[in-house]
């Protein structure tokens, strides 16, 4: 039985992970749960899965959780803060760590799991977007095993040769017969919305994804295709791919989750019902296959599979991300930070949908920063970019 720590247990990925545990109680045991401030949901999770440890992001939330658990006779030990999250990511008894805390906030605990040599199920994009080289160097040094959770990267992983899977981030794609990785994206809920209407798009419209059930921030990223841009950056680090070896195409049905093209002309594609429990179950049980709780794909109900090139006028954030990837990690870190600020401002109705790309571009072009050589330097770039984004939003609103 595998012992599991979930970083970000109350989020979308965390809940899907618990769904896989629920479907396979004889295979997985929750040792620790880590979350932000959602005390009510964390209490429910602790009472159902009875972890030994739990941690909240602040002491106020931790106190509230302790009170609820004590009233219900739970023996779960509750801690708080970033240090606690890092310690729970590195517990000796834990086999796997689901790294699903969104944003740069998830970086320290994800690195703690890597340094402890754990099998890390990577759902935190920012680990590679902001610290790609540093992160992969830590993986090699600690001999931790990295398994991608994003549906696209997991699909690519499943379609790659075993040698590349076992040497993730360092194996040569070309030497193993791979010519190109093809990332698919649905195009989001605004794929057919006239461009003239983009300025009036509401947060609810941007979050109404046609295929996937996701959190609001990542739903907006899907609408702008920034999510695909960040996945492009992540894919280059995960699979040791050059810019020429990664391609992004639109696939509105979200049935093919990504593809790998080989030198001999073959293309291997991973397909399935769009449900995050599938890649999560694959990574949790790897190299075995277990019940994910997801309904099997019914090919007779699939009317068509269509593909198209992305339009950068419709998706300027995708182009920004590709350009940032070519520029380096200072640029990708700045872009990611600016995007987090601009998306939150949009969700709070403080800026228009079209302002997201404008702010992101302003920040990346404004900041000329050296390449980071440490995590601390990454965090400095992140902070400067966030400050610049806040200032850019203020200017737009004046």
From Swiss-Prot:
Record-linked Gene3D superfamilies: 1.10.1740.10, NAD(P)-binding Rossmann-like Domain (3.40.50.720)
Catalytic reaction equation(s): 2-C-methyl-D-erythritol 4-phosphate + NADP(+) = 1-deoxy-D-xylulose 5-phosphate + NADPH + H(+)
Keywords attached to this entry: Isoprene biosynthesis, Manganese, Metal-binding, NADP, Oxidoreductase
SUPFAM superfamilies, A to Z: 1-deoxy-D-xylulose-5-phosphate reductoisomerase, C-terminal domain, Glyceraldehyde-3-phosphate dehydrogenase-like, C-terminal domain, NAD(P)-binding Rossmann-fold domains
InterPro entries in the cross-refs: DXP_reductoisomerase, DXP_reductoisomerase_C, DXP_reductoisomerase_N, DXPR_C, DXPR_C_sf, NAD(P)-bd_dom_sf
Enzyme category, top tier: oxidoreductase
Positions with a binding annotation for Mn(2+): 150, 152, 231
Binding of 1-deoxy-D-xylulose 5-phosphate, residues: 125, 151-152, 186, 209, 222, 227-228, 231
Subunit structure: Homodimer.
The protein's name in its UniProt record: 1-deoxy-D-xylulose 5-phosphate reductoisomerase
Organism of origin: Yersinia enterocolitica serotype O:8 / biotype 1B (strain NCTC 13174 / 8081)
């Amino acid at each position: 039985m595998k012992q599991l720590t979930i970083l970000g247990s109350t989020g979308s990925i965390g809940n899907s992970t618990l769904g896989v545990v629920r479907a396979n109680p004889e295979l997985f045991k929750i040792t620790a749960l880590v979350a932000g401030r959602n005390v009510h949901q964390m209490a429910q999770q602790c009472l159902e899965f009875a972890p030994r440890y739990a941690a909240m992001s602040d002491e106020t939330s931790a106190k509230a959780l302790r009170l609820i658990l004590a009233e219900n006779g739970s023996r779960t030990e509750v801690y708080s803060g970033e240090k606690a999250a890092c310690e729970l990511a590195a517990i000796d008894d834990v086999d796997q760590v689901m790294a699903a805390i969104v944003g740069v906030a998830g970086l320290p605990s994800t690195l703690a799991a890597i340094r402890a040599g754990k099998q890390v199920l990577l759902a935190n994009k920012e680990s590679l977007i902001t610290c790609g080289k540093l992160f992969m160097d830590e993986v090699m040094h600690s001999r931790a095993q990295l398994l991608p959770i994003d549906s696209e990267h997991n699909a690519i992983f499943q379609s790659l040769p075993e040698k590349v899977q076992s040497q993730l981030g360092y194996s040569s794609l070309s030497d193993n017969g791979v010519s190109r990785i093809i990332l698919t994206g649905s195009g989001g809920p605004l794929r057919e919305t006239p461009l003239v209407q983009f300025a009036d798009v509401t947060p609810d419209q941007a979050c109404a994804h046609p295929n996937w059930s996701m959190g609001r921030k990542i739903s907006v990223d899907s609408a702008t295709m920034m999510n695909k841009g960040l996945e492009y950056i992540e894919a280059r680090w995960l699979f040791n791919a050059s810019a020429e070896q990664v391609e992004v195409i639109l696939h509105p049905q979200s049935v093919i989750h990504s593809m790998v093209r080989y030198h001999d002309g073959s293309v291997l594609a991973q397909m399935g019902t769009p449900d995050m429990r599938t890649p999560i179950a694959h990574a949790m049980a790897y190299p075995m296959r277990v019940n994910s709780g997801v309904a099997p794909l019914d090919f007779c109900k699939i009317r068509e599979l269509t593909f198209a090139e992305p339009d950068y006028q419709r998706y300027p954030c995708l182009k920004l991300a590709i350009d940032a990837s070519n520029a380096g990690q200072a640029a990708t870190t700045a872009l990611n930070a600016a995007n987090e600020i601009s998306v939150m401002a949009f969700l709070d109705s403080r800026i228009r949908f079209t302002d997201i790309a404008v702010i992101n571009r302003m920040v990346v072009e404004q900041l000329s920063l050296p390449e980071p050589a440490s995590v601390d330097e990454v965090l400095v770039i992140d902070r400067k970019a966030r400050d610049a984004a806040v200032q850019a939003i203020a200017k737009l609103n004046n």
